[in-house]
Amino acid sequence: MVKRRPTLLAAAALLTLAAPAPASAARKQPPELTRIRCVPATSVTCRSGVKVTIGRQLQISGRRIYKGMRVSFRWPRGALATRLDRTRVGYVVRVPADTRAGRVSVTVSDRAGRRSNARRITVDAPPRIGGPAPSPGTLPDAFRGNGMWIWELARSERGDVAAIAARARAAGISTVFVKSSDGGASRWAQFNPNLVAALHAYGLRACAWQFVYGNDPLAEASLGADAIADGADCLVIDAETQYEGKYAAAQQYITALRATVGPAYPIGLTSFPYVDYHARLPYSVFLGPGAAQANLPQVYWKDIGGTVDAVSARTLAQNRIYGTAIAPLGQTYGNADPDDIARFRALWAGYGSAGLSWWSWQHTGEPAWAALAQPVSPLPLPPADPGWPALARGRKGDQVVWLQQHLAGFDPAVAVTGTFDAATDQALRNFQSSRGLAVTGTTDALTWQAVLGLPVQPVDWRSRR
């Protein structure tokens, strides 16, 4: 036994030298980037795996990476950093809005400050559509005339564009609104350049619409920009219950979308017709300066349970304060009465609307199509003025936000909170007095018309989160 002891010690030493490094040593290694590519890989504005437009997402693969890591974008004489996120497609990061166009190095750093190897990408500035923004209250050409909405293309004339064009021609339809995306991750393949080209060949405008939730506004804006890049003649934002209370998200979405497409591209909003009933929805952001130029409230009188006249009047009264041209979305689904469809067309023509559209192609029966094919019968007399929202102390909601954004320029003591508080009440009374109006503390027609002449004071909703 004594003679064999040195041999055993030597073997133990060799085993020690050959043993793998402990896990703690591996953790001390810096992160490693192995691949960068666009999200989604088929995106129009992400033309290759290493060429991406500012504001787009990138998917990052590598070793020792995790959610929350610092991601740096570096170029000569500049750098920006953001955080790595994890989604269903893996680890993703969005190219910051102020990144310089050109060749950029991307690295990630862990909590200890260890930096990965650099991967080079090419960053493009977002394309801009030239021309000045239209005058407030002017309906862009893309929304003029009659339109029909398509939810599922395959269930609308079985997706046959020639049949769609024939039906549209017979019904006087000039614009087709086709769903292009849902949320920030679901791009609908039915809206594509081939469809746009085919509709154009038949003399139809092809507009895209996207349903938004506000959970990932930058991704939703990117998908909207994708539809525009596919050739859409206009884009409509469909924001409903899911967007209530999400002012910061709405501002992020609009800012990102306009940064990509410019101020002139025609954008519309479709949502609930009764602003006071959905008081937490950020109409004032979607319809405010630099945002949508067309307001397409969903005036579904049969579903709402009122007459065409009553529902239309309340819709106009509730929405007119935003100063955005109104092109209402009417109801041809649910066996809508052809006489109601005719009345709706005549009434809104009397209100001066230059555009109407209908929901939806796949749910419209033959009697409704026949009603659309008839000429509009003018009203014997102009419709009565529907009035204006009467706001007073204690009221809450987006209409109060809009009022406060105007009054804040008259009286800096007014805070934009959405609550008609004592400061708002006093400012309104002082304003009424200064304009020679009846001092009531309530927004009647004359008060609204005077208040809306004040400049809109901007609000940074993103800083309030």
Predicted segments with their positions:
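Aromatic- and acid-rich polysaccharide-binding/catalytic face
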Residues: 232-243, 279-308, 359-363
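Short acidic, glycine/serine/threonine-rich helix-capping segments at coil-helix boundaries
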Residues: 391-451
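Active-site groove signature of glycoside hydrolases
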Residues: 174-182, 223-249, 357
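Acidic, Ser/Thr/Pro/Gly-enriched interdomain connector segments
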Residues: 141, 151-156, 376-418, 457-465
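Beta-strand/beta-sandwich contexts
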Residues: 25-69, 103-105, 114-130
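Aromatic-lined carbohydrate-recognition surfaces of secreted/lumenal glycan-active proteins
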Residues: 151, 205-216, 254-280, 324-335
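Boundary/entry segment of secreted carbohydrate-active catalytic domains
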Residues: 129-168, 173-174, 179-182, 210-214, ...
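Substrate-binding cleft of secreted/luminal carbohydrate-active enzymes
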Residues: 300-304, 324-381
